[in-house]
């Protein structure tokens, strides 16, 4: 568990200034990010790992990981240049900017120049997918699996209500193992005008997708 000063700093990181609904932009809470990183460290060990944060947004996940652990490489990738500017400021606030890199890219574009097969672990808080964008969360996971080396891991957050569906679908992928390693709570504040409640408490799963050695 980070010390109180670190927890306070993470809690003060900037979120989206003008979140884009088409990108399903929601800021990950510092509490959720810390819990996620602790569980990942317990599962595979973070020290010396090469990490990629896919769809990093304002950088809560990558900033938390770089603050808590001695990682060899940390790369954040996002399509939104405005979010990446905020992410850059957050990395400076946490004083980890020298150990982190950012890349603007559309990960869903097959022609994007991405460093595939080079990371030990990918972390993702993907879009959950609306009725007009169903399945995008699993597309993010598949991109994550492309980014990690054989034997590497993808850790992704998904609504607990979709657990059976996700694990069932992952079984169809060759060379991939999947398990739910934690159920967590995400206190999601109202982000868009159509949100009626000030906050919603969502049950989310941290799913571990393992890219098996070939």
From Swiss-Prot:
Disruption phenotype: Worms are viable and do not display obvious developmental defects; they however exhibit significantly longer lifespan and heat resistance. Cells show reduced N6-methylation of adenine(1717) in 18S rRNA. It catalyses: adenosine in rRNA + S-adenosyl-L-methionine = N(6)-methyladenosine in rRNA + S-adenosyl-L-homocysteine + H(+). GO terms for molecular function: nucleic acid binding; rRNA (adenine-N6-)-methyltransferase activity. The keyword Transcription does not apply. GO terms for biological process: positive regulation of translation in response to stress; rRNA base methylation; rRNA methylation. Its EC number is 2.1.1.-. S-adenosyl-L-methionine binds at residues 25, 28, 55, 58, 78, 106-107. Pfam families: MTS. Keywords: Methyltransferase, S-adenosyl-L-methionine, Transferase. It is an enzyme of class 2 (transferase). Disulfide bonds: none annotated. InterPro entries: DNA_methylase_N6_adenine_CS (IPR002052), rRNA_MeTrfase/Polyamine_Synth (IPR051720), SAM-dependent_MTases_sf (IPR029063), Small_mtfrase_dom (IPR007848). Catalytic subunit of a heterodimer with TRMT112/C04H5.1, which specifically methylates the 6th position of adenine in position 1717 of 18S rRNA. Heterodimer; heterodimerizes with TRMT112/C04H5.1. Belongs to the methyltransferase superfamily. PrmA family. PANTHER family: RRNA N6-ADENOSINE-METHYLTRANSFERASE METTL5. This is rRNA N(6)-adenosine-methyltransferase metl-5. It comes from Caenorhabditis elegans. The gene is metl-5.
